[in-house]
Amino acid sequence: TGRLGKHDVVLVQSGVGKVMSAMSVAVLADHFEVDALINTGSAGAVAPELKIGDVVVASRLVYHDVDLTAFGYDYGQMSMQPLYFESDPSFVETFEKVLAQASIDSKIGLIATGDSFIAGQDKIDAIKGHFPEVLAVEMEGAAIAQAAQSVKKPFIVVRAMSDTAAHDANITFDEFIIQAGKQSAAILVEFLKELA
């Protein structure tokens, strides 16, 4: 805990995957009574125009590994939840402004979440078969969004691209994860400066 500019902040390293990230949201909401949740980190680029180091701001998030279609839900939709989790629009707008001011290549759109590290075109094609507009894939965002929605907290998920999920993702991930983390942290600091 501490202050960043005029904001009280609590930094948490959630760990990898949907369960760990959702648990972090519960702790932040219950123990620290935070007003909002901002999640940053890395992701694998799916959109061909994205390069390592580019940033994706999730306007919405979806699970790419949930299948309750046998019960009448859309593919990716968790029971009694929306298919897509919508980020706070004012947060999206503020991140868009910060990224433009910093001249960082970025996109705003859909991020897909699942408990698998996506490496290989066949896996990307399967995800894009359900969600053609997906920009990036990662392992926490939609769970954070669902948990934030459950505790009625505004949220945003922002990812720096650490790899291009199609080929040798595991190799590029190891090389560029530090760079992606630094990029995400710098953007977050600028975002907090812009908040009223």
Regions found by a protein language model. Give the residues of each.
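Active-site-adjacent mobile loop/cap segments within catalytic or ligand-binding domains
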Residues: 122, 127-138, 142-177
